[in-house]
């Protein structure tokens, strides 16, 4: 063993001052426990500007009481140029404060010691077994460095724990190497590996003749935590009794604000806090400053002036003035670390629904129409679909011919109960015009129906005459009074909108021609009953007319004046008048659904949240 041995650490930022306090306290405790208090010195390397301009007198006194030797050093020559050159690689680590760690090359200038064990200020020796490194590296040379493999890349060593031999020549060559080359990681660990580690030589010829050597030591002398998934839990549990030293790597240290609030603490984190509490108690520090609040934020500039403790009362004005300045800096650091309060005034405004979209939504999905319908209408409609019972005679009493004063598809639309009184009055005033148009067009319409019925009579299944008679008798409607043109005529939901038929002759029955589109849908009506109720009903009406045979027409002729045969015979007399009346094209029931109850049947198929925007 060498005569002059030292355990050294480095302080290049005031943010690491709590770590320097805890490390020095723990090392002294373990040296005393091992009985080597006088054999191994403790040394602190600190930059001159930090010690003289930043630290308070109390901090200086505490450091001098912990470490037997404090060495003030200056930054490396051309350090600013080196930092600028290594900035790109250093950005990969997202640790800008490590740019000042290049001063670690000054360790080889400690020629007053024969061998040095270097420990980062964020390390914590757990027991005195870590002192065995001096025995393991007792034959170390100046060209060797003893270190532990880095968990992120095991072919490289971690520079947080190193055994080295101070040497002036090695220090000079190393510092020149730092100036001339770019560090792998932009910091001290990369450049020291490039200088001492043969694994970093990409040239095989140079690697074989490499003059320096990395001596790999056991991982138990530098267990880095947290390892963020790299750590093997079984191995950690197995080698736990053999661990000599813990290294708190990463941005968040045990003394940082983030770690104190958010970090998932483990037993080693708790051990560091216990050591710091012992340090505080031994030096009788105020409880209010026992846990310095150091910012976790990355710094791109020189570290600010911060002290972790308040000075005791003193009569020296210069000391009090310095302490006040440092306290102000601590308050600023607290404000920087405070979480910002969310401002409700700047909360993002809700995205309003465009007006066009609102109109589109209310046009296609009219829920008021569905809610205003009587309940019995929907029940009766469902019953009709189930039993397929449609009364042709009663439907004819409620159908109106197309004319220029009516809207398309009004013959098959359910009139809303909320119609304005003005519309009723206007409809009554147009009755005379409507009656004339209907009388003139009856003969042509019934001729079309008769032709369609005769062509399809052979392929259609005729219904039972008895059942038809009963259905007709049960559903026959009564002639409404002139004062109520809007009154419901039958139970099949088919009404005449705003047109009174009280002036029609008893022997004339209006009827509407059949459109080709209805015949097309009738062929494929299976499965469409629920979605196309109006079309289905109109087809059923026309088909029922096709089912009548000659005997059925004769039987119904004597029972009522509103039968289909009587209407046909009466309308055929008006052929001459009908030729003078222009034929109006029937609406396309495939698309003219706005005035029908089509939406009231299909709207329930859409869930409430089908649209992306919510209409307020």
UniProtKB/Swiss-Prot annotation:
GO terms for biological process: glycogen biosynthetic process. The keyword Metal-binding applies. UDP binds at residues 10, 16, 95, 120, 122, 247, 250, 253. GO terms for molecular function: glycogenin glucosyltransferase activity; metal ion binding. Pfam families: Glyco_transf_8. Induction: Induced during the diauxic transition. Its main location: cytoplasm. Residues 450-461 have a biased composition (Low complexity). The keyword Transferase applies. It catalyses: L-tyrosyl-[glycogenin] + UDP-alpha-D-glucose = alpha-D-glucosyl-L-tyrosyl-[glycogenin] + UDP + H(+); [1,4-alpha-D-glucosyl](n)-L-tyrosyl-[glycogenin] + UDP-alpha-D-glucose = [1,4-alpha-D-glucosyl](n+1)-L-tyrosyl-[glycogenin] + UDP + H(+). It is found in: Cytoplasm; Vacuole. Coiled coil: none annotated. Residues 283-320, 335-354, 371-516 are annotated as: Disordered. Its EC number is 2.4.1.186. Residues 400-419, 462-485, 492-503 have a biased composition (Polar residues). Belongs to the glycosyltransferase 8 family. Glycogenin subfamily. This is Glycogenin-1.
């Amino acid at each position: 063993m060498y005569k002059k041995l030292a355990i050294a650490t480095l302080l290049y930022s005031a943010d690491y001052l709590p770590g320097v306090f805890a490390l020095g306290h723990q090392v002294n405790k373990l040296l005393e426990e091992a009985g080597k208090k006088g054999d191994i010195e403790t040394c602190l390397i600190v930059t001159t500007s930090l010690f003289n301009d930043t630290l308070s007198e109390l901090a200086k006194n505490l450091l001098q009481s912990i470490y037997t030797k404090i060495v003030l050093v200056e930054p490396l020559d051309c350090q600013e140029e080196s930092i600028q050159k290594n900035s790109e690689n250093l950005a990969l680590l997202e640790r800008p404060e490590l740019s000042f760690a290049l001063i670690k090359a000054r360790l080889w200038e400690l020629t007053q010691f024969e061998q040095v064990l270097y420990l980062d200020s964020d390390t914590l020796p757990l027991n005195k077994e870590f002192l065995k490194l001096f025995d393991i590296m007792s034959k170390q040379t100046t060209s060797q460095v003893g270190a532990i493999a880095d968990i992120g890349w095991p072919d490289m060593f971690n520079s947080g724990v190193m055994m080295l031999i101070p040497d002036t020549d090695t220090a000079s060559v190393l510092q020149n190497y730092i100036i001339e080359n770019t560090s792998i990681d932009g910091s001290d660990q990369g450049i020291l590996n490039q200088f001492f580690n043969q694994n970093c030589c990409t040239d095989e010829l140079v690697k074989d003749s490499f003059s320096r050597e990395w001596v790999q030591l056991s991982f138990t002398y530098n267990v880095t935590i947290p390892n963020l998934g790299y750590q093997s839990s079984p191995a950690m549990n197995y080698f736990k009794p053999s661990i000599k030293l813990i290294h708190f790597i990463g941005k968040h240290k045990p003394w940082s604000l983030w770690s104190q609030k958010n970090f998932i603490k483990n037993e080693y984190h708790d051990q560091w806090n216990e050591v710091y509490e012992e340090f505080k108690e031994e030096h009788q520090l105020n409880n209010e400053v026992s846990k310095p609040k150091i910012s976790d934020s990355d710094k791109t500039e020189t570290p600010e002036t911060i002290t972790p403790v308040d000075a005791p009362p003193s009569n020296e004005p210069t000391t009090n003035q310095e302490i006040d300045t440092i306290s102000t800096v601590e308050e600023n650091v607290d404000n920087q670390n405070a979480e910002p309060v969310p401002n409700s005034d700047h909360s993002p405004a809700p995205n309003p629904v465009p007006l066009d979209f609102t109109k589109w939504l209310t046009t296609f999905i009219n829920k008021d129409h569905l809610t205003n319908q009587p309940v019995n209408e929907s029940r009766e409609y469902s019953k009709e679909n189930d039993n397929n019972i449609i009364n042709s005679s009663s439907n004819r009493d409620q159908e109106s011919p197309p004319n220029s004063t009516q809207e398309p598809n009004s013959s098959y639309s359910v009139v809303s109960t909320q119609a304005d009184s003005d519309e009723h009055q206007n409809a009554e005033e147009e009755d005379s015009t409507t009656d004339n148009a209907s009388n003139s067009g009856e003969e042509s319409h019934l001729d079309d129906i008769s032709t369609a019925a005769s062509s399809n009579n052979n392929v259609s299944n005729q219904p039972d005459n008895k059942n038809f008679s009963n259905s007709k008798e049960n559903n026959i409607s009564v002639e409404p009074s002139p004062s109520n043109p809007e009154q419901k005529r039958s139970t099949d939901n088919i009404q005449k909108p705003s047109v009174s038929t009280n002036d029609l002759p008893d022997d004339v029955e209006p009827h509407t021609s059949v459109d080709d589109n209805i015949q097309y849908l009738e062929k494929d009506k299976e499965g469409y009953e629920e979605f196309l109720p109006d079309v289905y009903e109109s087809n059923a009406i026309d088909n029922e007319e096709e089912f009548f045979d000659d005997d059925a027409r004769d039987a119904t002729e004597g029972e009522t004046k509103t039968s289909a045969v009587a209407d046909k015979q009466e309308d055929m007399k008006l052929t001459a008048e009908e030729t003078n009346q222009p034929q109006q094209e029937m609406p396309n029931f495939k698309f003219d659904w706005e005035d029908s109850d089509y939406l009231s049947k299909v709207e329930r198929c859409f869930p409430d949240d089908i649209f992306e925007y919510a209409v307020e």
